[in-house]
Swiss-Prot record:
GO terms for biological process: CDP-diacylglycerol biosynthetic process; lipid droplet formation; phosphatidylinositol biosynthetic process; positive regulation of fat cell differentiation. GO terms for cellular component: endoplasmic reticulum; endoplasmic reticulum membrane; membrane. This is Phosphatidate cytidylyltransferase 1. The gene is Cds1. The chain crosses the membrane at residues 96-116, 149-169, 183-203, 230-250, 279-299, 357-377. Its main location: endoplasmic reticulum. Residues 1-68 are annotated as: Disordered. One of its GO terms (molecular function) is phosphatidate cytidylyltransferase activity. It comes from Mus musculus. Its cofactor is Mg(2+). Keywords: Endoplasmic reticulum, Lipid biosynthesis, Lipid metabolism, Magnesium, Membrane, Methylation, Nucleotidyltransferase, Phospholipid biosynthesis, Phospholipid metabolism, Phosphoprotein, Transferase, Transmembrane, Transmembrane helix. It is found in: Endoplasmic reticulum membrane.
Length: 461
């Protein structure tokens, strides 16, 4: 464990910044015998490594280079650093929003590819931090196994998605039928192979560090892959369940920044000193108003409200349906005090607008805690941003730290309060059954509908 003892850049056991010698250690000798090394390992196993003793032992990650385009640097060279950063963030934000609108126009399949691309980049940024922190140890197979586990977990989650939403397409392909039928076993076998490779890669002098990074990889997978899978599940419920939550988080991020930039005086949380109560409160009200208006606009169009379905006859995704009651105007009675102010007793709203208030409230009150969590993580490793992918913003993970928390909430919200039985999904499951099973279900359903009076009894001749 001697390598871990020197990780913070200490020159040696007696150098500046070195921890005091513990019981059983030589206090100043350069030569260590085999028995002394074994004794250190035993002490480390009982009391823990020096890693857990404080942030001072955590090595700093090398700072990222500035990727701001030269044309922007020249145009903003006369401004103070505060206003220069404001303009860079603003220009890049408008650029990203424009590209996002373009991808929305291109359809749900491109949105799914975007989510997968963001997932891979976020995983890369978090894993790279771990690799930079421990790069001097040359851990065997660390990066290879990390990407292998990413592949395995994606195969597990998205194989389930293919089985659920592409059943009619799978029926036409014999090879895919095998993969879908034994999907979970194949997923487990792939993961087990990676697990065995990890065990075989263990090296005595790096045991503890290798298990640290094994846990690091799995927590990263939990944060990125699981949440991106939930985002795509939300998208299949209808593009509106994807757009309103994501745009609410973006709106909160922008408006909280603007309110904090111009009016911020009172610090909000120590983890993120630049966050202020003024920005937090201003972002909350702005986000609720934005979400309510966005829900009204998007609820008018089938393209946004219909569940995303794969149609085998046209070999593409379609968003055509009769909108549910959630997206049909209804009259709501106003409270008495509003009736007096507005001189009307009722107001026409889409029911989804009521749900949008819950989504916007979560995005503005709880969503920022995803950002605070990320700030704590970055402080622990003494870094400013996860990466320097986007000038003025940092890495992709810096932009989506709140989105992952939002995705989980939306999925839980849909399954708890919105989703009912899906006839299309039930039909797809029926189509993959054996003919005898389909006939039994048909007879049972016919008897049930006849007993309820929906079907007329069949007269026997």
């Amino acid at each position: 464990m001697l390598e871990l003892r020197h990780r913070g850049g200490c020159p040696g056991p007696g150098g500046a910044g070195a921890p005091p010698p513990r019981e059983g250690e030589a206090a100043g000798g350069d030569h260590e015998t085999e028995s002394t090394s074994d004794k250190e390992t035993d002490i480390d196993d009982r009391y823990g490594d020096l890693d857990a003793r404080g942030d001072s032992d955590v090595p700093e990650v090398p700072p990222s280079s500035d990727r701001t385009p030269e044309i922007l640097k020249k145009a903003l060279s006369g401004l103070s650093s505060r206003w220069k950063n404001w303009w860079i963030r603003g220009i890049l934000t408008l650029t990203m929003i424009s590209l996002f609108f373009l991808i929305i126009y291109m359809g749900s399949f491109m949105l799914m590819l975007l989510v997968l691309g963001i997932q891979v980049k976020c995983f890369h940024e978090i894993i790279t931090i771990g690799y930079r922190v421990y790069h001097s140890y040359d851990l065997p197979w660390f990066r290879t196994l990390s990407w292998y586990f990413l592949l395995c977990v994606n195969y597990f989650f998205y194989g389930e998605t293919v089985a659920d939403y592409f059943a009619t397409f799978v029926q036409r392909e014999e090879q895919l039928q095998f993969l879908i039928r034994y999907h979970r076993f194949i997923s487990f076998a792939l993961y087990l192979a990676g697990f065995c490779m990890f065990v075989l890669s263990l090296v005595k002098k790096h045991y503890r560090l290798q298990f640290y990074m094994f846990a690091w990889t799995h927590v990263t997978l939990l944060i990125t892959v699981t949440q991106s899978h939930l985002v795509i599940q939300n998208l299949f419920e209808g593009m509106i369940w994807f757009l309103v939550p994501i745009s609410s988080v973006i709106c909160n991020d922008i408006t909280a920044y603007l309110f904090g930039f111009f009016f911020g005086r009172t610090p909000l949380i120590k983890l993120s000193p630049k966050k202020t109560w003024e920005g937090f409160i201003g972002g909350f009200f702005s986000t609720v108003i934005f979400g309510f208006i966005a829900a009204y606009v998007l609820s008018k169009y089938q393209y946004f409200v219909c569940p995303v379905e794969y149609r085998s006859d046209v070999n593409s995704f379609v968003t055509e349906c009769e909108p549910s009651e959630l997206f049909q105007l209804q009259n709501y009675s106003l409270p008495p005090f509003l009736q007096a102010v507005l001189s009307r007793e009722t107001v026409s709203l889409y029911p989804f607008q009521i749900h949008s208030i819950a989504l916007s409230t979560f995005a503005s009150l709880i969503g920022p805690f995803g950002g605070f969590f990320a700030s704590g993580f970055k402080r622990a490793f003494k870094i400013k941003d996860f990466a320097n992918t986007i000038p003025g913003h940092g890495g992709i993970m810096d932009r989506f730290d709140c989105q992952y928390l939002m995705a989980t909430f939306v999925h839980v919200y849909i399954t708890s309060f919105i989703r009912g039985p899906n006839p299309s999904k039930v039909l797809q499951q029926l189509l993959v059954l054996q003919p005898e099973q389909q006939l039994n279900i048909y007879r049972t359903l016919k008897i049930h509908l006849t007993e309820k009076g929906i079907l007329q009894p069949t007269l026997k001749v």
